Amino acid sequence: MKEEQLSLFKQALSRLEVTKQDREFLYTVSMTLSGHPEVFRKCYLAFMNGEDSYHYHPMIGAPLDFFFEGSEVRVKRLKEEVVLSRGHFIQYASYVDLCFSRIYPLGSVVELDRDLLPQDLVAAFESEQMDFFVVLSGRRVVMETGSYIDYIGYTWPFGLRFDTAPLFVSNLFIKRVVSEGYTDMTDERYCQEAFRREYFNEGIVSSVYGEEIVNED
């Protein structure tokens, strides 16, 4: 994790209308979520799916417990806890995602989680006897709604074809990375400045959270 990401996240937290003490607690929680992206993914999926709670109890380190209680979300770590409105929790999650989620290089091949995909898409993959592999060709693409989709991609190994529409891929749908594309310092700097800082300054978040925030309003 880079200092620029931590600095940006602190700025993001300052936009959250909670007490200073709650903000410090949420910062501590975010260090676990950013260091364990699968925990963050499973937690937010549990929230989206209407589950009652999500628990992360590692062998080493402090446990985290999330309780989804109607219009509120209770976050507990050891003996400390904070209660957020649903809207504030969604806003918090969008900042964790914006600042800390890995942005995979162009050309990366990822496997999608079939259990999270629409049935018609699953059927399309299975009819061609294909693995659920997608090659990523676009990142954090801003849509007409003003939010961004994490990736645009095409089925692997076919790639771009004139008779095939691109796939919109959320971070939540990615089960694993099969092969990473090329990256260097220029690419990393671009991701930090364009996809993180500029989006933060413009108030652009992932469509996963943008739609939720609209629904909350």
Describe every region a protein language model picked out.
Residues 118-124:
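Short boundary/loop segments of OB/S1/cold-shock single-stranded nucleic-acid-binding domains
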Residues 1-69:
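N-terminal intrinsically disordered, low-complexity, charge/repeat-rich segments that act as generic
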Residues 77-118:
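Mixed-charge, Lys/Arg-rich low-complexity intrinsically disordered regions
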Residues 48, 56-73, 124-181:
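Basic/aromatic-rich interaction segments and small domains that mediate binding to polyanionic partners
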